[in-house]
């Protein structure tokens, strides 16, 4: 294709998106691009001779009066048809624009366009693989392309043309090895989108040399491993606050926090607690003193609540340190192996048959690998569970790697282990910390626990595990059918083709048969021994005492050992069989049937082993070790046909576990929390942490809550414990609509359950009064991390976020990213969960009051965390609205009210007063 090929970048605005002949074009815009420059533009409004729907008018800003005297499509079709001849058709979502335009041209008598086409959505996904959104508006913001009038075709076409030029520039920067690999996969893309890779290769006069930081192995080009300088290197020593940048505000409470932290790092107790409320600058408050201590050879492990907050800590907070320090800080992020890509496995998927969508994902991954230093798949913002490819390429730990692979020495998990030895800061999350703390025993680090109020919850949750005995049986059955099938391709065919020996097959088959036959026997005996089969409750849960489960396993020890031996055999055999599979693949000895059978076997057998991962918990020696710390119970939904028997394991208390399995491996432990604690919740908190003897520092907020915020407590909301869930969802939906109609500002509603999020979302989505709003719902319209990024990129239309889980704590939404916070329900944990029932019963048996001792302090702490999402800077202003009347009408409600920051006005109102109160607050001046 000639260098001066013309690209016609087209955007349409239409009366609707359905291509059933009922909709019409109301604006056509085209921008011509040659040699990476805009050379011409064409734009026209079009009279559709039909009403323009209100939502289209609101979105595009094109009203019926604007098109009343515009030409008909018949009048401009000839011009459009001629304009597009001998061009490459480009659009952002080409499937819509090209097909819609063709349909309209044919409708008025013109032949169908026969043009090559390029889709800028797919190109953007490939070349900018880490973006959270590929909407044109979000892309233009991320790439800093001016976009003055989103959803108007002339503006969108110009922006798409500039985006196309950026994409061509990106392609021009790609190394030859990567470019050739992308070209070879280009047929999987829409239309002729892959032609841009071919064009670039054809136009290159010589090979483009690799960036010195890149290396090519096989079909993959990736970044070379980072080399950290020795952490004990001589670093110029300077006073803690000497290099304070002039652009960074000095906050008195933050400076006091830094001085206290520095003092405690040098001379403090083994465990110290810092209560630093929002606005104190908590994170920098411990990072800068820690960085200062690096000059004296100290090293740190920093743990926060979630992967999302872990990413935020690295991307935002750690990067700020460069402004304060005369040296570079070495940082490593640690997550579970499932977050990382296995290069060897990914390389083999490139040689396997794939559908077009999977090829697109592979192309994104290939580009990403030239950018990432970590191999952390979270960087890609994928919804991993929606991508079958990720089942094949995610890491399963260093122990499962093929040491003969050319990728072994470059493996990201192995790199991470090496980097960790010289890392100044190791950043992780609480879930990883409690499982892997022992790995830091010889590194003499100080442990910093950020969002410490969540460490206990995470500890208990991660020790709460389930083994579904019926699911094990189902998987074993499925696997045996796949292996022994007489009517379809089976392992017998693999043996005939000499892809597997008969001896190997028989051994594998025999072990799976052991599981298939023994687990149901064990399950039935357990059901008969421990469950009272009364068809009353939907789900019956029965706690199991240590003596009884120990005696049961002892009676059935032969069954237990049979299954345990089968598990161990499969755990050892599967990696070897997988390596054999890869060898056969490399030798091109597998046809599609044998390839698919091997893949099915590995998928099912790995799922089976995952279901049995907790089987060793039942070993007699393990039961004895955990007798005083482990809770066990059975659940069985008796009223259901085909009910599953599930065995649950839970940690009884967190204190001893944390002292033994976490704190003991570090020189010192510093706890930080941004929550407001009452005297009752603080005592509960430190007791659960097992840090009773710790020293306590407390700081004042820097915010003027009297003028920056206000709390509204709705006293006539229905009692959540007295009304059905659907009725309460109706009430919440009505109130949220009222709140949204009273203000068009970024609004977040915090829920306790995903189920209620879905119920409310379903009602709001279909309500005409919510048309101006973009509604985001956690786990409905996206993952927490994805929705957070969307919510943070403030749109021209107001956004409503329905959230739960991680949004209760640690998410930073300053300024106009969040102005109205709604708490749908006080955040009590579900009392009906068997785990909580056992905790509460145990407290009651010890003479306590479970509600006051456990349920209430946990809910109050979580409520305080939620309220803390609203005001994040001294310039923020916002409302917090509580739609749970218990905060007013129950005696314990005062404990929730006491967590509002000092000085924040609190007003009790009725539902009908909401609109007036909201309007008055936002109309008033500070």
Q: What is the role of each PLM region?
A:
Residues 1-2, 166-236:
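Acidic two-metal-ion nuclease catalytic site recognized across multiple nuclease folds
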């Amino acid at each position: 294709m000639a260098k001066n090929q013309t690209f016609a970048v087209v955007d349409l605005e239409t009366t609707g998106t359905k291509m059933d002949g009922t909709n019409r074009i109301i604006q056509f815009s085209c921008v011509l691009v040659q040699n990476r420059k805009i050379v011409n533009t064409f734009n026209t409004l079009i009279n559709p001779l039909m009403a323009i729907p209100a939502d289209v008018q609101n979105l595009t800003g094109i009203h019926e009066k604007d098109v009343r005297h515009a030409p008909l499509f018949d009048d401009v079709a000839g011009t459009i048809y001629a304009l597009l001849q001998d061009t490459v058709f480009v659009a952002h979502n080409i499937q819509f624009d090209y097909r819609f335009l063709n349909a309209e041209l044919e409708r008025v008598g013109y032949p169908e366009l026969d043009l090559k086409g390029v889709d800028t959505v797919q190109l953007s996904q490939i070349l900018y693989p880490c973006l959270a959104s590929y909407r044109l508006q979000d892309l233009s913001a991320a790439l800093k392309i001016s976009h003055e009038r989103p959803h108007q075709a002339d503006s969108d076409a110009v922006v798409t043309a500039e985006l196309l030029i950026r994409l061509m520039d990106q392609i021009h920067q790609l190394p030859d090895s990567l470019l050739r690999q992308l070209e070879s996969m280009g047929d999987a893309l829409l239309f002729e989108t892959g032609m841009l890779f071919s064009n670039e290769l054809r136009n290159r006069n010589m090979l483009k040399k690799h960036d010195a930081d890149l290396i090519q192995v096989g079909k993959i080009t990736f970044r070379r491993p980072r080399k950290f300088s020795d952490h004990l290197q001589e670093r110029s020593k300077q006073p803690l606050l000497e290099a304070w940048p002039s652009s960074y505000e000095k906050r008195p409470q933050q400076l006091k926090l830094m001085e206290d932290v520095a003092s405690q790092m040098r001379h403090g107790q083994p465990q110290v607690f810092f209560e630093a409320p929002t606005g104190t600058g908590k994170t920098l408050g411990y990072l800068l003193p820690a960085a200062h201590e690096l000059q004296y050879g100290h090293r740190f492990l920093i743990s926060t609540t979630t992967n999302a907050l872990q990413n935020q800590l690295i991307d935002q907070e750690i990067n700020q340190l460069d402004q304060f320090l005369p040296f570079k800080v070495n940082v490593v992020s640690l997550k579970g192996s499932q977050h990382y890509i296995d290069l060897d496995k990914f390389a083999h998927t490139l040689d396997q048959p794939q559908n077009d969508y999977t090829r697109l994902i592979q192309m994104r991954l290939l580009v990403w690998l030239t950018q990432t230093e970590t191999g952390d798949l979270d960087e890609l913002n994928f919804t991993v569970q929606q991508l079958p490819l990720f089942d094949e390429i995610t890491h399963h730990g260093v122990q499962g790697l093929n040491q003969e692979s050319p990728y072994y020495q470059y493996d990201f998990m192995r790199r991470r282990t090496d980097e960790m030895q010289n890392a100044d800061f190791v950043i992780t999350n609480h879930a990883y910390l409690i499982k892997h703390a022992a790995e830091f025993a010889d590194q003499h680090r100080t442990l910093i626990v950020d969002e410490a109020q969540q460490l206990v919850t995470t500890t208990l949750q991660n020790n709460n595990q389930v083994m579904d005995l019926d699911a094990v049986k189902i998987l074993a059955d499925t696997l045996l059918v796949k292996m022994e099938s007489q009517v379809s391709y089976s392992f017998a065919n693999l043996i005939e083709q000499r892809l597997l020996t008969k001896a190997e097959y028989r051994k594998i088959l025999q072990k799976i048969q052991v599981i298939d036959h023994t687990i149901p026997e064990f399950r039935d005996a357990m059901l008969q021994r421990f469950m009272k089969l009364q068809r009353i409750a939907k789900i019956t849960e029965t706690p199991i005492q240590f003596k009884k489960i120990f005696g049961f396993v002892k009676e059935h020890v032969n069954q237990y050992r049979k299954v345990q031996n089968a598990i161990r055999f499969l755990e050892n055999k599967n990696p070897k069989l997988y390596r054999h599979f890869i060898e056969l693949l490399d030798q091109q000895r597998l046809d599609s049937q044998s390839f698919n059978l091997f893949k099915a076997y590995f998928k099912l057998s790995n799922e089976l082993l995952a279901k049995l991962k907790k089987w060793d918990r039942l070993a007699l020696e393990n039961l004895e070790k955990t007798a005083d710390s482990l809770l066990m119970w059975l659940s069985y939904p008796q009223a259901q046909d085909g009910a599953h028997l599930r065995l649950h394991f839970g940690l009884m208390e967190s204190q001893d576990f944390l002292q033994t399995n976490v704190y003991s491996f570090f020189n010192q432990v510093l706890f930080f929390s941004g929550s407001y604690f009452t005297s009752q919740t603080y005592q509960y908190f430190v007791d659960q942490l097992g840090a009773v003897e710790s020293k306590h520092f407390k700081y004042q907020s820097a915010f003027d809550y009297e003028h920056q915020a206000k709390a509204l407590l709705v006293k006539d909301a229905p009692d959540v414990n007295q009304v059905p869930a659907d009725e309460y969802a109706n009430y919440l939906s009505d109130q949220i609509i009222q709140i949204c109609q009273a203000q068009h500002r970024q609004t977040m509603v915090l829920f306790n359950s995903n189920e209620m999020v879905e119920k409310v979302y379903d009602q709001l989505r279909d309500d005409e009064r919510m048309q101006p709003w973009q509604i985001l719902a956690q786990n409905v319209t996206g993952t927490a991390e994805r929705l957070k990024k969307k919510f943070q990129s403030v749109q021209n239309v107001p956004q409503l976020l329905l959230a739960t889980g991680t949004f209760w704590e640690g998410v930073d939404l300053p300024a106009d990213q969040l102005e109205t916070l709604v708490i749908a329900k006080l955040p009590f944990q579900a009392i009906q969960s068997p785990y909580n029932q056992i905790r509460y019963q145990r407290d009651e048996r010890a003479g306590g009051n479970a509600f006051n001792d456990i349920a209430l302090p946990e809910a109050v702490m979580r409520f305080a965390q939620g309220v803390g999402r609203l005001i994040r800077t001294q310039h923020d202003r916002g409302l917090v609205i509580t739609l749970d009347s218990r905060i007013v009408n129950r005696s314990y409600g005062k404990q929730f009210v006491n967590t509002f920051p000092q000085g924040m006005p609190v007003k009790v109102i009725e539902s009908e007063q909401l609109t007036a109160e909201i309007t008055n607050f936002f109309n008033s001046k500070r």
